[in-house]
């Protein structure tokens, strides 16, 4: 039996998650499909970073922000699929069929593309056996600062992320060393100066050539590095290794011949501020959508999502209101409001 949804959202980052919430608010039967095992998009790459620029929201850690987004997205019980990679979308009469890499088919009246910059995966360290240390002390992101307290840390990379981590970890760590394969760091000059002033040791023209394990072979104990100019090598004892070599962005989504959407820079979908694209029934929100006057920040993402969902609502129901009702007067929240107020009034023990 085919389950047909009003809207299928592709992408579980901030744009997709808020679209799921707003679709429920507009009374749409909603499905969200995310290729990764976790929802949250690229914010997951920086769980310890503070986000400052969301209206009415005090500075919030990326990890907490994602948890709140997910909780909000589930308000109206959408169907959510993770570990599900969409690779092809076709148009069939009045429906869209969303095909996944495993051969599944999902049927929908509309599609909302919220895939951001694509499927993002860190560039791995290309040394034999490196993968076995990913469960111990080889890291591709900083999930928790607590992990690095009083530790000797080696960071490989010279971009903004690498030097930001060096600056942020230096007050906590026993020592921080940055190695970079080129002769000049690509991070912002001011951040590099901040790292140097904080006591971070920076070694350019240097790469990791070998990882040496501890006695029980469960973690990295020594790292061998080589200077590409002098050809000198040395071995350093470390507690934690962070690899910051950038990210691979996979953009494998394709369409059948009946679907044509112009792209900018051969990736971003050109559309309108309303979330509409050149293909009726396909909408977009967030980083993947390009239009004049777009705000490429999180706060703009939420407006993109609301506009796209409102466009979907009127596409499916031309007589529907163009915008959703404000939450303070929306009957959908009546019971939820009562429950929250009652909890606020009950004294804590």
UniProtKB/Swiss-Prot annotation:
It catalyses: 2 reduced [2Fe-2S]-[ferredoxin] + NADP(+) + H(+) = 2 oxidized [2Fe-2S]-[ferredoxin] + NADPH. GO terms for molecular function: ferredoxin-NADP+ reductase activity; flavin adenine dinucleotide binding; NADP binding. The keyword Flavoprotein applies. FAD binds at residues 34, 42, 46, 86, 120, 287, 328. Its cofactor is FAD. It is an enzyme of class 1 (oxidoreductase). Its EC number is 1.18.1.2. It comes from the Bacteria. Gene3D superfamilies: FAD/NAD(P)-binding domain. Binds 1 FAD per subunit. InterPro entries: FAD/NAD-bd_sf (IPR036188), FAD/NAD-binding_dom (IPR023753), Fd--NADP_Rdtase_type_2 (IPR022890), Ferredoxin-NADP_redctase_2 (IPR050097). Transmembrane segments: none annotated. Keywords: FAD, Flavoprotein, NADP, Oxidoreductase. Homodimer. Belongs to the ferredoxin--NADP reductase type 2 family. HAMAP family: FENR2 (MF_01685). This is Ferredoxin--NADP reductase 3. It comes from Lysinibacillus sphaericus (strain C3-41).
């Amino acid at each position: 039996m085919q389950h047909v949804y009003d809207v299928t959202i592709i992408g579980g980052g901030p744009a997709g998650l808020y679209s799921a919430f707003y679709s429920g608010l507009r009374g749409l039967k909603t499905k969200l499909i995310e290729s990764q095992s976790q929802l949250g998009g690229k914010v997951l790459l920086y769980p310890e970073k503070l986000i400052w620029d969301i209206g009415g929201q005090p500075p919030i850690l990326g990890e907490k922000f994602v948890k709140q987004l997910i909780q909000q997205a589930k308000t109206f019980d959408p169907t959510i699929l993770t570990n599900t990679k969409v690779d092809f979308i076709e148009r069939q009469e009045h429906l869209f069929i969303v095909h996944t890499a495993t051969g599944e088919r999902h049927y929908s009246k509309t599609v909302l593309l919220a895939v951001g910059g694509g499927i993002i995966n860190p560039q791995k360290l290309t040394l034999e056996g490196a993968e076995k240390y990913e469960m111990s002390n080889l890291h591709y992101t900083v999930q928790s600062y607590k992990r690095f307290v009083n530790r000797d840390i080696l960071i490989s990379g010279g971009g903004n992320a690498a030097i930001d981590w060096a600056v942020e970890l230096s007050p906590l760590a026993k020592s921080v060393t940055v190695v970079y394969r080129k002769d000049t760091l690509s991070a912002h000059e001011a951040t590099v100066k901040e790292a140097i002033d904080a006591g971070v040791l920076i070694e350019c023209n240097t790469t990791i050539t070998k990882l040496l394990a501890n006695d029980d072979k469960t973690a990295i104990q020594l790292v061998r590095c080589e200077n590409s100019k002098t050809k000198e090598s040395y071995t350093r004892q470390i507690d934690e290794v962070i690899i910051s070599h950038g990210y691979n962005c996979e953009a494998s989504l394709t369409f059948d011949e009946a679907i044509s959407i112009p792209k900018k820079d051969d990736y971003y979908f050109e559309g309108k501020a309303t979330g509409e694209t050149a293909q009726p029934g396909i909408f977009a929100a967030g980083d993947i959508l390009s239009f004049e006057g777009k705000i490429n920040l999180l706060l703009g993402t939420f407006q993109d999502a609301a506009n796209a969902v409102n466009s979907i609502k009127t596409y499916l129901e031309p007589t529907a209101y163009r915008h959703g009702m404000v939450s303070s007067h929306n009957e959908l929240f009546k019971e939820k409001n009562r429950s929250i107020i009652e909890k606020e009034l009950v004294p804590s023990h």
